[in-house]
Swiss-Prot record:
One GO cellular component term noted in the UniProt record for this chain: nucleus
Pfam families attached to this UniProt entry: CP2 (PF04516), GRHL1_C (PF25416)
Misc remark: GRHL genes (GRHL1, GRHL2 and GRHL3) show a paradoxal lack of redundancy despite their extensive sequence identity in the DNA-binding and protein dimerization domains and the fact that the core consensus DNA binding sites are identical. They have related but remarkably different functions during embryogenesis because of their differential spatiotemporal expression patterns during development.
Name of the featured protein: Grainyhead-like protein 2 homolog
Amino acid sequence: MSQETDNKRLVVLVPNDAVFNPRRAYTSEDEAWKSYLENPLTAATKAMMSINGDEESAAAIGLLYDYYKVPREKRLLSLNKINEGHEDQDKRNCLPANETPSNLSTGENRVQVLKTVPVNLSLNNDTVESSNREKYTTSLSESPQPAPASAVTVVKAEEFTPVFMAPSVPYRSDGEEPRGVIFEQTHFGVHSITTHSDYLKDDQRSTPDSTYNESFKETTEKYRTPSVGTEEFLYEQTASSTFQYTLEATKSLRQKQGEGPMTYLNKGQFYAITLSETGANKCFRHPISKVRSVIMVVFSEDKNRDEQLKYWKYWHSRQHTAKQRVLDIADYKESFNTIGNIEEIAYNAVSFTWDVNEEAKIFITVNCLSTDFSSQKGVKGLPLMIQIDTYSYNNRSNKPIHRAYCQIKVFCDKGAERKIRDEERKQNRKKGKSQAAQAQCNNSADGKLSAVPLQKKSDITFFKTMTDLDVQPVLFIPDVHFGNLQRTGQVFYNTDDDIEGGVLVKRLLRPVDEDYGPPAPKQMKEGSRKVLLYVRKETDEVFDALMLKYPTVKGLLEAISEKYGIPVEKIVKIYKKSKKGILVNMDDNIIEHYSNEDTFILNVESLAEQGYKITLTEI
């Protein structure tokens, strides 16, 4: 019995009357303690303290760590439950004989456990004089029972009223006696002396949730602290020069004053576009730095929306396939390592996300000529623009945070290089004439002639920033393909709930018979009503022709049933397998728009009593 008593130590907590410094404001006691004890107490830390002779200091701090690991609601237990659960008579003997636990908690039904921040935490050792121990223990009663020095450890703590928060335990009045809280310490004893002032200086104290916002008051950018949730963070940039875009293509030598840069491109050739951030906070790594950019090919600003749609529809009607796009991107590894979430949101636009902390690069090609928008020969080509809109990824707004453009003229068969050479020859002729005129003026006494400024050849074209961010760009989506784009989630209506990452895509609602140039050939209209498929089994060498009366799944099932004698009601699944090995459910859109006159291998698989599964593998 004596051995068990020696192994059990007691901790007495005595609240102090000292007023806590009002500058130190915490929102809760748990948050304040975590600001002191934010690093885990590892075995290596305990070993280092043991080497320095602080074995019991480590044990005391470990007690605090264990205490604050328990959720707060589980620590605030009623005193009656604690009194019923404690059967150890040695612990009760530490209380004065004339005072019981029930008297100790008069006017209060909760145990006050390490209330708020223990600023002056002192743990006495075996060498502390008995007079000092009696000074602390007399706060419990006028006639306390003596306790061995090795069995009692006294903890002194200050308490204060947290700012912006009512205290969870009533504070004692002026004439009220200080209360003591007893803890049982069974595994270790503490005999070293420590103070919390060693961990935090008065001049350097700050609240646990203090931030560095004060140091960025003068900047235009707005950043939230790291404690802000991902959904609440808004990457805001107000400076117009925040982003910089470059096109790796030769710039025209004949740049017009007041207009954007002009670049010559070849149709079908891929060019690299580099996107980067050049704001004032370039040196800082933003915690949430994803943005969404949309690269699009549009007409100049002098063309209104109806005119642009008229030109696009005329161009689309002259293409050899309805799938032909205005703008395509290359699947280069160099590009896909810097961008993500690529979406072909329109025939003339591509959307993707990228990290402003890193430089992004994407390779694009333009599939239309500047002369493709008129049926007349010898007409000067229309200038086009490559426009880049960048949106804040988390800000659900259809207004970009940055917009820039570059004018382009698209040629065929290396026409861009020939155009540059022609401009170089013209410039050299002007240079020769200018030098001759300058020499004549120098011969005269007072004749002066300013030299004509000459443009230098540049293989990099910088985009020009646009100040108008309110005008919505015109995105071209043919009506015949809108249903398929909507099914795949690439088109969103103009509503507040259907804006993703700040990118707004509008459906171009136009009557089918509206005149946007020459009408499409009648063969294309008739071909959309009937679909012809060439199908053979894997063991066959000759294809069978399946003529679908209706371009739907039902029409396909009826054609298969008629050709191969399989009842329609027995076919439970029908799939299409692409050349890349992608297996998809066959639907009406695939049959109507993407399967006419295609060749397939038919595979019929029996599913026991359920029916048949049919797979059409594209070849």
